Regions:
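Active-site proximal beta-strand in glycosyltransferases
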Residues: 86-88, 101-126, 176
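A short, histidine- and acid-enriched strand-loop-helix "catalytic/donor-clamping" loop
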Residues: 94-96, 112-136, 150-153
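A short, active-site helix/loop in glycosyltransferases that binds the activated sugar's phosphate group
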Residues: 97-100, 141-175
């Protein structure tokens, strides 16, 4: 209504959006669906490099969605760059976001670094075996830090987030802008 149009790219479960927002569905292998969480896709379901990324990362014990989704989003956006002036990444921070940033101006919102979640889970882990599993699962966090350090525009939602992101991800404070939620 203010002269701009918003489009969203999303994977399962697909978001319910305002009717004025056009959704481009980026189907995944849906490994984390509610009915069959952790299902292993059959080989004939692997139809793209994104699918291969998703299943191999998951098979290695890593949360695969950020990398696989960012790759799918890049492939979808690459064919439609003329339609967009700006891309807003909401904390995916997969390597595909760096590729998107090369073809379209990109801003990232970081609510808080997942390093905080990882640190809390590691502290609560009862034994070394569980800590190894947690470290593997959060393997994507290193990628998110690398991507965040290379993105020029980062929106954060609190002063605590600025402190955590700067400390844990090595992002220069001068590239973060505080925008309160609400």
């Amino acid at each position: 209504d203010l002269g701009h149009h918003v489009a969203a790219f999303g994977g399962q479960p697909y978001p319910v959006l305002d009717p004025r927002v056009r959704l481009t569905q980026l189907p995944s292998l849906d490994i984390f669906n509610d009915l069959y969480p952790g299902r292993m896709p059959a080989f004939w379901e692997l139809k793209s490099l994104s699918d291969l990324i998703e299943v191999t990362q998951y098979s290695a014990g890593t949360f695969s969605e950020p990398l696989a989704f960012s790759h799918r989003a890049y492939r979808a956006l690459k064919a439609r760059t003329a339609e967009f002036d700006l891309v807003h990444d909401n904390q995916c921070l997969g390597y595909g976001v760096l590729a998107i940033n090369k073809i379209l101006p990109t801003v990232v919102t970081l609510h808080h670094p997942i390093t905080v979640d990882r640190r809390l889970e590691m502290a609560a882990a009862p034994n070394w075996h569980k800590r190894i599993s947690i470290a593997r699962w959060y393997g994507f966090v290193k990628m998110q830090g690398r991507v965040a350090r290379r993105i020029r525009r980062i929106v954060v939602v609190s002063e605590n987030s600025i402190d955590d992101i700067s400390r844990d991800m090595g992002v220069d404070r001068s590239r973060m802008r505080l925008v309160h939620v609400g």
